[in-house]
Amino acid sequence: MKITFVGEAVSGFGGMETVISNVIHTFENSSPKINCEMFFFCRNDKMDKAWLKEIKYAQSFSNIKLSFLRRAKHVYNFSQWLKETSPDIVICIDVISCLYANKARKKSGKQFTIFSWPHFSLDHKKHAECITYADYHLAISSGIKEQMMARGISAQNISVVYNPVSIKTIIVPSPERDKPAVFLYVGRLKFEGQKRVKDLFDGLARTTGEWQLHIIGDGSDFEKCQAYSREL
């Protein structure tokens, strides 16, 4: 079975890359009959590719400013690639790729099943309506499943799969009674939107007892988050 993961270029340093890489390696290690590849729609060649070291991938490049022409080039390039590779399943890691995959399938004349596998809330994503171009859907939370259904997708075509995690035997001990509780946040600093660091601050502000919050990360809302934390 050939499985292709498609999507717009990512940074190469995020959690989504880790999840996708783990899933691909799990698939391929579980059966020699499963072959996975990736296909990216790119505007430039800035994506860090260290995470793709053991993953076969291809890219379509287009920096055309007019969106409909840029999309047309990506669809054409992907359709040509589909003719050569003939995947059985295409899994779209973002919403716009559902549109690309659907149009490329028609253009290539190939038959395969399209799954959407969005890693972000649909309520905060541009082109969220494009998710309806997929045949079936993988939701990483019950909330995203509800967002899919709100866009007219049947619950029968949605599977809630959550995010894969590695099993650890290490247990983080509870804080000692005379020591403050220590919380750790690792990730992008988005005040609201996808990450909603504001909710973390609001929740901790209502917490009784001594505690500490350590934050590792950066983002466009760094100063906003910092200022809000001082107000509480």
Residues covered by each model-derived region:
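Carbohydrate-associated surface elements
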Residues: 143, 164
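A conserved mid-protein helix/loop that constitutes part of the nucleotide-sugar donor-binding site
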Residues: 15-25, 191-209, 220-223
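Membrane-proximal helix-turn-helix segments that form the acceptor-binding/catalytic region
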Residues: 79-80, 120-137, 151
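A conserved nucleotide-sugar
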Residues: 31-37, 201-232
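Short His-centered aromatic/hydrophobic patch
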Residues: 71, 92-98, 118
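Conserved donor-binding/catalytic core segment of Leloir-type glycosyltransferases
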Residues: 4-6, 176-204, 214
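N-terminal strand-loop element at the rim of the active site
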Residues: 6-14, 18-72, 81, 219-221
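A short beta-strand/loop micro-motif in the catalytic core of glycosyltransferases
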Residues: 90-91, 134-142, 159
